[in-house]
Amino acid sequence: SHTNLTTLSEEEIEEDVIKSSNDIKAKKKKKAEFFSYPYGEYNQKVIETIKSLDFRAIFNQNLGAVAKESDIYDLNRIAVSKAAELQTKLAYEYLAAKWPTRDEMVTNNRLRRLRVKTSPEIEEAQLYLSGHGWRRVELEGGVLDLKVDLRLKYSRNRIFLKTYDNELSGKLIMKR
């Protein structure tokens, strides 16, 4: 199904995903080995529940590249709506970045603090938040430490850090 899993209990998530997996197995005569979050929407509860269901990999809908050090349970999957977009999106390189949790970044549906760790060589980059656009940011020792007060404008908000070498890392922040 395409249920918004973030609105379900752990038991309901498991039930929904197992039912969908069984439907796929019945129709295709093959076990579903990979999972993609419906509409790209997920939170920590969804991640932990899906990880327990024995999938080989889990895909999100965050724009970005994948590398050998990518988390197999949080792989970027590019949504492409026009052929012209494909070349642009495939040009992104993987940016290894350690993001804070949603609760460390957001209070009352406002982005308050962002502390992202990446390569010490990166001194400046661009930061994007849905509905607020791109802005130039400086990093110290590969760390972006930014205090902001930006409202999450949508139910699903994307946040990206992009270097001037076209390396990209991003996260999805759900509005509560």
Region locations from a protein language model:
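Metal-dependent polysaccharide deacetylase catalytic core of the NodB/CE4 family, i.e.
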Residues: 1-46, 56, 69-76
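Detector for Asparagine
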Residues: 4, 22, 43, 60-62, ...
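Repeat-unit-sized solenoid/scaffold elements
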Residues: 36, 58-60, 64-69, 75, ...
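Active-site-adjacent pocket scaffolds in enzyme catalytic domains
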Residues: 47-105
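Long, contiguous hydrophobic alpha-helical segments, chiefly transmembrane helices and signal peptides
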Residues: 35-38, 59, 80, 116
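Terminal accessory/targeting
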Residues: 80-176
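Generic serine detector
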Residues: 1, 9, 20-21, 36, ...
